[in-house]
Amino acid sequence: MVATLLRDDPAADVLIVERGDDVGGTWRSNTYPGAACDVPSALYSFSFAPESGWKRAHGTQAEIYAYLRRVAREQGITQRTMFGCALRDAQWDGDRARWVVSTSRGDLTADVLIAATGALSTPTLPKVPGLEMFRGTMFHSAEWNHDHDLTGKRVAVIGTGASAIQFVPSIVDKVEHLTLFQRTASWVMPKRDHGIASSVRSLYRRFPLIQKVVRGAVYSQKEMYVVGMTKPFARKYALPLFEKRARSVLRKQVPDPELRDRLTPDFAITCKRILLSNDWFPAITRRNVDVVSSALTSATENGVVDAAGNEYPVDTIIFGTGFTPSEPPVAQHVRGEHGRSLAEVWNGSPSAHLGISVNGFPNLFLMYGPNTNLGHSSIVYMLESQAAYIADA
């Protein structure tokens, strides 16, 4: 967003308020083992800052974080950022036609307020009775405790979403036993990941147009999925093929029919985001893994309890319970013309014009706003489109 504004007006008076100590957002914070992107590297980069050095078809957390830091530095973003500064409140002042912004480091005023807090900024922890009594170690995957050695530990993992599908295969060989709590099974497809040869990276550096063509080809391929997912004439043929492929993977990688049945979703494929992994099923079929088809209902001093009342002794609880993309915490702190917060106006059902602007909140723009996420391609494309719209407004 800021890079777009500065390209249009290099002298623009722009200040970024960032509660973290560095740029990078989710790729700065999520450092769990195996953290990587499920979108091809060819698309997971800005069009104005192509990266020829990706070492894998799907970038790792370390690669993406380094890329974002470099882009921020080169685009003049870092020097316009106030780090370690958390938003407390933002109120529209109609008399002055300005936003009055209160932060942990003082008050600011602005003609325009852009909420670019993202959808994956605040981890969600389930409200489970007894957690306060648990004597072991517990943490959310987005706040991974690297000081806690999992070697020989009995671990409970809560959740089987996009984070767990990456970190569980990375820790399963280290732990003594892993108990996986799965509330809802997900459709899983192979991840077309592979190394990118140094000769290819060199080719991209020497001939950027080739990389641009590859990017366009990958984008077009991803867009074809939309046709198969949304157009009635295509859904009739495409969705059964998608599901057949997913069931084939499940059948080959999970030999136990009872476990395979529990890992088979009870909803049509594409109703939720499809997870991509080559090592998820092999990991959770290990002898030291138990899959519990239940939510975590309570905790004790030495373990966790499922819905049937069964207790599992564990030393460590890892929450892979995701975030609250439909209820961004920033919505509680931004107040419009009538003094009501975004959260109050939305009342549990977020909506915005083009996912960007909300009636009653003048000169407020949302990045990654309601209903702008994707289930098939790169959010980077959406963010650039939103940034261009806001810059023209």
Per-region residue spans from a language model:
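Short hydrophobic core segments
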Residues: 17, 87, 107-120, 155-158, ...
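Alpha/beta-hydrolase fold catalytic core
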Residues: 240-313
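Glycine/threonine-rich phosphate-binding loop and adjacent beta-strand/alpha-helix elements that clamp
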Residues: 320-391
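Beta1-alpha1 glycine-rich phosphate/pyrophosphate-binding loop at the start
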Residues: 1-81, 182-183, 252-258
